[in-house]
Amino acid sequence: ATNFNPEINLREVSAPGSYWEDGHWVEIPAMSIKREYNFEGVGMKDMYLLHHEEIEALAANIPHVKRIRFFMTFGQSYLTHMKCLENVGMLRTDPVEFNGQEIVPIQFLKALLPDPASLGPRTVGKTNIGCIFTGIKDGKEKKVYIYNVCDHQECYREVGSQAISYTTGVPAMIGTMLVAKGLWNKPGVFTTDEFDPDP
């Protein structure tokens, strides 16, 4: 089972990865760049480079940024199951005929998998979501790691969901609150990184 929308999660993981470097997009085969990283509060994990929509907005809104990459961790069991599903065609996104009707295999699979919201009471452990920044400050190379650690069970007690939904929903709720209060207010459609972070 996935801890977020299964269709979106499986599409992200099985799709080619990409990252922004030197003013253009670089595409790589799915899951082809893997790093081992020691995450604060979580420990050593394998992380894989994926394409994610956040990096599109960051590349567009941070002038002169040299490189932006997005990594996500996955256990070997998850990856093995995903590869089996891919091998038998269950991650296909094109319609196929089945018993006289058209179905999209990945959408059918989503209907069979548990609703991620139902997994909150039994999800244990912690998440670590962060950004590693490297660059030059005052003529010297500098590296900064900003991160957030959330405990699945603490999140569930607070809002009735596991930490993945919590860390997705809370920033969106804060942004909505800032718009409702008029602190973030300009005509058009914008991503959060285009607004004042300290209203």
Locate each region found by the language model.
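C-terminal catalytic/substrate-binding lobe primarily of soluble NAD(P)-dependent oxidoreductases
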Residues: A1-P199
